[in-house]
């Protein structure tokens, strides 16, 4: 339905962003992998999108790389996995790292991603192993880096909670990852990388 958007970044606070396309603001939910590389507010961006309509909601998801959108869609084909876990996957690891985990059958590494337990990880390996090599295909669209938000520590805590971490755990992870002057995307990236170790 809506496959791609090109417009101006009008708002961004993980996991939400608004892209202004000729005066219409499209609100999208995006994984941290996209937020890491978004241009600053007021700059142009092109996003691959995934439109989802359910009985009680309509959602639009945005991705800088086609491979991320493909992985988002494929992960949701696994029984018991929805958009929230698919976003957590893309927020926790790169497409290439996920493909390696699935191809290697690394259940332990997969269970470090929020929302994925042992049985879900086993289903992912079983159902996605044949397609894992295709996940990395699809390049990035050109982008810049964004400015630091007013309070990167609290924004990172909120983003980690939305990825499935409990409030106390999200706050601890953000505090441990935070260094003065860090942008919110950097804090979240360091927190997620630390959690996966």
Swiss-Prot record:
It comes from the Bacteria. Residues 65-143 are annotated as: Domain II. Residues 144-153 are annotated as: Flexible linker. Keywords: Cytoplasm, DNA damage, DNA recombination, DNA repair, DNA-binding. It is found in: Cytoplasm. Homotetramer. Forms an RuvA(8)-RuvB(12)-Holliday junction (HJ) complex. HJ DNA is sandwiched between 2 RuvA tetramers; dsDNA enters through RuvA and exits via RuvB. An RuvB hexamer assembles on each DNA strand where it exits the tetramer. Each RuvB hexamer is contacted by two RuvA subunits (via domain III) on 2 adjacent RuvB subunits; this complex drives branch migration. In the full resolvosome a probable DNA-RuvA(4)-RuvB(12)-RuvC(2) complex forms which resolves the HJ. NCBIfam families: ruvA (TIGR00084). The RuvA-RuvB-RuvC complex processes Holliday junction (HJ) DNA during genetic recombination and DNA repair, while the RuvA-RuvB complex plays an important role in the rescue of blocked DNA replication forks via replication fork reversal (RFR). RuvA specifically binds to HJ cruciform DNA, conferring on it an open structure. The RuvB hexamer acts as an ATP-dependent pump, pulling dsDNA into and through the RuvAB complex. HJ branch migration allows RuvC to scan DNA until it finds its consensus sequence, where it cleaves and resolves the cruciform DNA. This is Holliday junction branch migration complex subunit RuvA. It comes from Stenotrophomonas maltophilia (strain R551-3). The gene is ruvA.
